[in-house]
Amino acid sequence: LPYTGVPFGMNFYAPQTTDQKGSWWFHPEDRTFQGYRVTHQPSPWMGDFSHLLMTPVSGSLSELSLFHAQSSYRPEESLFSPVEINLTQLRYQITSQLIPSMYGGILTIDYQQKDNHLLLTLPGRYQVKQLDDHQVAVKVINYSGCEDPDFSFYFVLHFEQPLTKWFAPSSGED
């Protein structure tokens, strides 16, 4: 798996190419990009110790689903290294770069079209709350291999540009 992260970091990142194969959500020969998977403790054998998916998209989607948001990409033209992921989504003409840090990471997205979005896929139980014009706080409960049924993964997304759509506090279960 092409994990990007820092030694002893709190999170790791990888491209997700399928959501149909359980813990085996990346294959090097797949040409489908579903988004950047953020995971606290990755393991294809036992599953993630909590995860979520961030998918850059442009334009409108016929349905708000991962299937309708995914794009093709060329793995041979992408960069997968321990310190960076860089790839181009062909459907949306989006080039993005993800660089990890100890507690988070920086996702730089170069959109070429208008009406741009970042789709969050939050499997399991979740809560979302917009903190201000630049920040969204999320709690996800979708652990694997944990005795605590309420083991939670907390994170805050900070955006350089102000959010154009206000998020009402929401919670649910996927």
Regions found by a protein language model. Give the residues of each.
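Accessory carbohydrate-recognition regions in carbohydrate-active enzymes
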Residues: L1-D174
